[in-house]
């Protein structure tokens, strides 16, 4: 199994269990999340569910919780929304911190393509939920989540150059 860590903080953000699609010249990875019910245990001990007051359309058990698989698996922490000014300040600092960690062609590709990826992110800024890794470091990579038109499940965007592949 491959795990992808935040290059700056070491927080685990993604694994190969969640397939990704490269967009914006490989600067961003697009990953489909999914709402799942966690903690629901269906115990059927009787032969007559209607006599027990149990029906299949009752909804979700009190102890069951709906979570997004990626957020739950990697214990991502939701952050307050960013306005344009806050986001530009963040991305400038992130680029400054990340660039020296990249080598050779990766650094050149990053410098060449990060501006268009940043513009793409800015165009969707109002639609995003923002997440960081479990450690909640100041220098963490942001993970962006949004809902595509008509989708009930969130799509996540990762800044690909800021991820480090680790074999488990």
Curated annotation (Swiss-Prot):
Localization per Swiss-Prot or TrEMBL: Cytoplasm
Major subcellular location class: cytoplasm
GO molecular function: calcium ion binding
Highest taxon, organism lineage: Eukaryota
Residues of the TCTP domain: 1-168
Pfam families assigned: TCTP
Cellular component, GO, one term: cytoplasm
Keywords of the record: Calcium, Cytoplasm
Coiled coil: none
Function of the molecule: Involved in calcium binding and microtubule stabilization.
Family, as annotated: Belongs to the TCTP family.
Protein name (Swiss-Prot/TrEMBL): Translationally-controlled tumor protein homolog
Origin species: Solanum tuberosum (Potato)
């Amino acid at each position: 199994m491959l795990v992808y860590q935040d290059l700056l903080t070491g927080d685990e953000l993604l694994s190969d269990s969640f397939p990704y699609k490269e967009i914006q010249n490989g600067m961003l990875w697009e990953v489909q999340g999914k709402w799942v019910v966690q903690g629901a245990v269906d115990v059927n001990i009787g032969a007559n569910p209607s006599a027990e007051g149990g029906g299949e359309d009752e909804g979700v058990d009190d102890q069951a919780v709906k979570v997004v698989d990626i957020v739950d698996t990697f214990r991502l922490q939701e952050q307050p929304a960013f306005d344009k000014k806050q986001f530009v300040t963040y991305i400038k600092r992130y680029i400054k911190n990340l660039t020296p960690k990249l080598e050779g062609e990766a650094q050149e590709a990053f410098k060449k393509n990060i501006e268009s990826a940043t513009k793409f992110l800015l165009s969707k800024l109002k639609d995003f939920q923002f997440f960081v890794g479990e450690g909640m470091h100041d220098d963490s990579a942001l993970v962006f989540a949004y809902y595509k038109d008509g989708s009930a499940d969130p799509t996540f965007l990762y800044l690909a150059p800021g991820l480090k592949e680790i074999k488990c």
